[in-house]
């Protein structure tokens, strides 16, 4: 391991896999605000971050936990919740006077159509300008949860009750997810005008 004078120990955050300093240096060098998106096992976190002398400064923040305030009955880890979190974030950022930013996904892999890009699409639909390529964004039907509704319709009741027990326990039928998504999006629009 650390034997000899030629061994160089990496920075702690690099060893832990939390920070890629090459990417971070390029983002810091741009001197623009960054939309930082982090996906945890249960929630989506989105922050508008500015570089400061004493470290990064968070200007605007939204998490999927905030969606409960607007009546979201689903969990915070699906694509619909990621989109709504990005949409809420975009509305908050515009209200604070920020209309342009760049995306910072950290060490997460960049895969087309994932929750990271659902957050990006939500922020874009809210009115933020973020440089991107349209081919990476997920489809609208997937964001609205139509694939879940179609899958639930093809199941019998016992199988549906077992598979979607958490949704049913919260009072949301899986077939109603697209309509519920639209109602929560409208509530976000009303609250952030």
Curated annotation (Swiss-Prot):
Q: Which GO terms describe its molecular function?
A: 5S rRNA binding; structural constituent of ribosome
**Which residues does UniProt call coiled coil?**
none
Which CDD domains does the protein's record reference? Ribosomal_L18_L5e
UniProt superkingdom: Archaea
UniProt keyword terms in alphabetical order: Ribonucleoprotein, Ribosomal protein, RNA-binding, rRNA-binding
| UniProt-listed InterPro entries | Rbsml_uL18_euk
Q: Which GO terms describe its biological process?
A: ribosomal large subunit assembly; translation
Gene Ontology CC entries for this record: cytosolic large ribosomal subunit
Note one Pfam family from the annotation: Ribosomal_L5e
The record's note on quaternary structure and interaction partners says: Part of the 50S ribosomal subunit. Contacts the 5S and 23S rRNAs.
Q: Which family does it belong to?
A: Belongs to the universal ribosomal protein uL18 family.
- Function text: This is one of the proteins that bind and probably mediate the attachment of the 5S RNA into the large ribosomal subunit, where it forms part of the central protuberance.
- Name of the protein described by the UniProt record: Large ribosomal subunit protein uL18
- List the top taxonomic levels of the source: Archaea, Methanobacteriati, Methanobacteriota, Methanomada group, Methanobacteria
Encoding gene, per UniProt annotation: rpl18
